[in-house]
């Protein structure tokens, strides 16, 4: 019984802590409101580019996306959408990322795609294909899926979402389709923790 009460106490304490943080968030500082209406589904969307050095740091060094995922309630979806406006293979990478999402293979190809893009080693879709094949995706899966109806739909979803939110720079996080995290307003000395807490707080607003 003591353990149950302790667990309940911790749960209430955590909820109060998150709600308190949400109340302390200031529009124009930690976040910007981009819509009057929240999305029907609770979600966090990160827009990124494999060519973006800051996205690389977010993903590979500070692991902010994974820390956000680990902190999210179970009923909140986390999505990563690739943008088309950085790098000469950006459109091919958006399509390849759509294929990775369709196959549930994001974790297999994300790191090698980041590494290759940062080294400017991607000259064509063939180079992207080679990375997929070297990381557990079969030729049949890649060739049969890259221009499939499902992948075309996921490409359009990424492009349309970036246009809807008027994304001009990355990495860029949006919470419930209503709020954009403003990294310039976060605590520089404790940036990663503040970023994650801001996302959690915005989910409560």
UniProtKB/Swiss-Prot annotation:
GO biological process, one term: cellular response to antibiotic
GO cellular component, one term: outer membrane-bounded periplasmic space
PROSITE patterns: THIOREDOXIN_1, THIOREDOXIN_2
A Pfam family that the UniProt record links to this protein: DSBA
Statement: the UniProt record of this protein carries the keyword Transferase: no
Main subcellular location of this protein, as a coarse class: periplasm
Gene3D superfamilies: Glutaredoxin
Keywords associated with the record: Disulfide bond, Periplasm, Redox-active center, Signal
Protein localization: Periplasm
Signal peptide: 1-22
Domain Thioredoxin as annotated: residue spans: 23-201
SS bonds (residue pairs): 52-55
Example GO molecular function: protein disulfide isomerase activity
Domain of life of the native organism: Bacteria
InterPro entries xrefs: DSBA-like_thioredoxin_dom, DsbA/DsbL, Thiol_disulfide_DsbA, Thioredoxin-like_sf, Thioredoxin_CS, Thioredoxin_domain
Coiled coil: none
Function: Involved in disulfide-bond formation. Required for HI transformation. Acts by transferring its disulfide bond to other proteins.
Family, similarity comment: Belongs to the thioredoxin family. DsbA subfamily.
Full protein name: Thiol:disulfide interchange protein DsbA
Source organism per UniProt: Haemophilus influenzae (strain ATCC 51907 / DSM 11121 / KW20 / Rd)
């Amino acid at each position: 019984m003591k353990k149950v009460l302790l667990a309940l106490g911790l749960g209430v304490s955590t909820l109060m802590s998150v709600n308190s943080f949400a109340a302390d968030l200031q529009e124009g500082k930690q976040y910007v409101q981009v819509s009057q209406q929240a999305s029907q589904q609770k979600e966090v969307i990160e827009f990124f580019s494999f060519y973006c050095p800051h996205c690389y740091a977010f993903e590979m060094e500070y692991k902010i996306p994974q820390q956000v995922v680990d902190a999210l309630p179970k009923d909140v979806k986390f999505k990563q959408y690739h943008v088309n406006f950085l790098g000469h293979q950006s459109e091919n990478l958006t399509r390849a990322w759509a294929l990775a999402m369709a196959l549930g293979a994001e974790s297999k190809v994300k790191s090698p795609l980041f590494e290759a893009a940062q080294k400017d080693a991607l000259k064509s879709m063939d180079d992207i294909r080679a990375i997929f094949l070297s990381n557990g995706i079969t030729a049949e899966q890649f060739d049969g899926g890259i221009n499939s109806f499902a992948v075309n739909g996921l490409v359009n979803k990424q492009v349309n979402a970036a246009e809807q939110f008027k994304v001009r720079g990355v990495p860029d996080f949006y919470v419930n389709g209503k709020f954009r995290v403003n990294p310039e307003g976060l605590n520089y000395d404790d940036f990663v923790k503040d970023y994650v807490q801001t996302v959690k707080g915005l989910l409560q607003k």
